[in-house]
Every structure is written in structure tokens, then in C-alpha cells.
Amino acid sequence: HGHHVFNSVENCPKPVIAAVNGFALGGGCELAMACHMRVAAENARFGQPEVKLGLIPGYGGTQRLPQLIGKSKAIELLMTADMLDAQEAYRLGLVNYVVPADQLMDKCREILQKIAVQAPVAIAEIVRTVNAHYDKTRDGFREEVERFGACFTTEDFKEGTDAFLNKRKAEFKGR
């Protein structure tokens, strides 16, 4: 049932950022990949070592890793059980930022503060439509069109438009 938990993280309508300090291996790496963004401390290490136990990742690692870093490199890492250091994870697109360990939580808060002033309904729809791209049972483009249209009916859209036209900061209510 772990995959249901990880899918819930991935589909959470509120932003979820993984703050990785140290090792994120196996399920820990899979949990980080389920988050919307990842911030790594300089000492972070990432890997999927399940093949050493005769297993494959069971909580979405075989799906999310190629989505994040590309098929060829993902297959290499899954088959060899090699680990990535924080800088390589950043270079490959697995993490959004690499910071000194003592700045890890501050960087996460900084990102969340930037997001917190945006329209909550639109943030939730971004999560939904981006994830639809990777869901083979859904048409990501159709989902985007439907959710885009739905945003026009929200109070947040009206507030955002009014704030823009009146050159003031929007005060979103999440409705």
C-alpha cells in the first residue's frame, strides 16, 4: 500500500518539497521523487539499490526516475544501483537546488513563500495537469484544457485579474 501513500504525495494539491539531508536510498529516494520539488543538502546521496536484493523499486521509482532524469540514465542507475551525489542529482534534474546543510530548511521555506502568494486553486490545477501528462490513463492536454477553463470560474481568478488591472498585489482566498 506504500505506492498509494507516495501517489497521494505526488497528487497533493498543496506544494510538497523534499528536503534531503544525507542518504535518500530505495524508498527514501522514491518518496523524494514523489514530491513536487526536491532541495538537497550538499551531503545528500540518492539511489535505488533494490537490484542488489534481487528486487526492483516498488513505490514508483521505475516510473518517476525516468520522468525526472530521462530513460537511459534511469535504467543505468536502476540496473547498477549506483548512487548520485547532490551535484550530479542537480545536473541530471533530480533535484531543484543544492545548498549547504545549514541552509536546507531556509531554502525550502523561501520556495514555499514564493508559492504561498499565488492562487491556491491554480497551484492545485498545476499539480493535477502536470501529473496528467505522465498518467497513461489520462490525456494530459485534455486535462489541461479542462482545468484551465475551470480556473476562469474561481474567485481567485477574479481577484488576480482585478489586482493586475488595478496594479495591486492579489489576495487569494483559495476559492
Whereabouts are the PLM-identified features?
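Amphipathic alpha-helical segments used for helix-helix packing
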Residues: 122-128
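A short structural micro-motif
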Residues: 132-133, 167-171
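Helix-loop "lid/cap" segments that line or gate small-molecule binding pockets
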Residues: 77-78, 129-134, 147-152
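Conserved donor sugar-nucleotide recognition element shared by glycan-biosynthetic enzymes
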Residues: 1-2, 157
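Crotonase-fold acyl-CoA enzyme core
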Residues: 7-121, 137, 154, 159-162, ...
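Hydrophobic alpha-helical core bundles mediating ligand binding, dimerization, or RNAP-core interactions
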Residues: 2-6, 112, 130, 141-148
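A general structural signal for short secondary-structure boundary/capping elements
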Residues: 65-66, 126, 146-147, 172-174
